[in-house]
Every structure is written in C-alpha cells, then in structure tokens.
Curated annotation (Swiss-Prot):
Main location: nucleus
Taxonomy, superkingdom: Eukaryota
Protein name per Swiss-Prot or TrEMBL: Nuclear receptor 2C2-associated protein
Keyword Nucleus carried by entry: yes
Family: Belongs to the NR2C2AP family.
Keywords associated with the record: Nucleus
Entry GO CC: nucleus
Keyword Nucleus: yes
Native source organism of the sequence: Danio rerio
Origin organism lineage: Eukaryota, Metazoa, Chordata, Craniata, Vertebrata
Length: 141
C-alpha cells in the first residue's frame, strides 16, 4: 500500500529561493499541508528539488501542486542510492494549472535520493512555485 514517504527525517534541498527569502518562500512550505504557503524558486532554468530519505524507498507516485503560470513544463525524475550518482527514472509533463497533479512511476527502482528537475517553466523568467510536493510509495524495511 502506497503511503507518503516524506517524514521529519527526510532531508530536502532546492536549487534556489526567490530573493533568498526562506522565511516567506522556503522549501519547508512544500511539505506543511498549508495551501497558502509555497516554495518559490528564483529565476533561471533547471530549478530542482532534491530529497534524501532516511532509508531506501520504492517510489510509486509524485504529487505536485503548482501555481498556474509558474509550473514546470518539462520535468525529469532522477534517483539513486545514498552514495551513487543520480540516474534517470522518468520524464513527465505537468499541466499549467493550480490543481494537485499526480505522476505514477512504473517499475521504480529502490532509491534513497530523489531529484525532481524542472527543466523549464511556463513563467518567462523560469520561476517555479510549488504549493504541495508529496512522494508516495513503500519503505524498504
């Protein structure tokens, strides 16, 4: 049964934060279940979110909620074990809207690190705004 793999021990990093204002637009806001807070990247292409889980996980689904006009157009998912180089898992193409979107991952390998790369954005300046990010799957016990 798939469950959220994001927990207090999950470490996250992002490519940038708008104006370095982490108090208002920091990465933690993707995981706080508050529909009024968000991570807002600075401008530039290839923005990303990197997650490191406390143990190996089998990812079955990625859920993202963008702000319309600031969505990823072409995205890729990469993953690896803790000390390995990231490997390509999947390309996906979100719609430019405010809805929670779901991207199933068929035959996902066991990973401990997961990177979502927003290769380009619907925003002219390349900014990405994410209100919700959740990773579903199973923990490798």
């Amino acid at each position: 049964m798939a469950e959220s793999l994001i927990c207090n021990s999950t470490q996250s990093r992002v490519s940038s934060v708008l104006n370095r204002d982490v108090k208002q637009f920091g990465k933690k806001f993707m995981f706080d279940s508050n529909e009024e807070t968000c991570w807002n990247s600075d401008q530039g292409e290839s923005q990303w979110v990197l997650l490191e889980f406390p143990q190996h996980v089998k990812v079955s689904e990625v859920r993202l909620q963008f702000q319309g006009g600031f969505s990823g157009k072409s995205c890729k998912l990469e993953g690896s074990s803790k000390d390995e180089n990231l490997r390509h898992i999947l390309n996906f193409y979100p719609e430019d809207n405010n809805s929670l979107q779901s991207f199933p991952i068929p035959d996902a390998p066991l990973v401990q690190k997961l990177k979502i790369v927003f290769e380009n954005s619907t925003d002219f300046f390349g900014r990405i705004i994410v209100y919700t990010l959740d990773i579903l799957g199973e923990k490798d016990l």
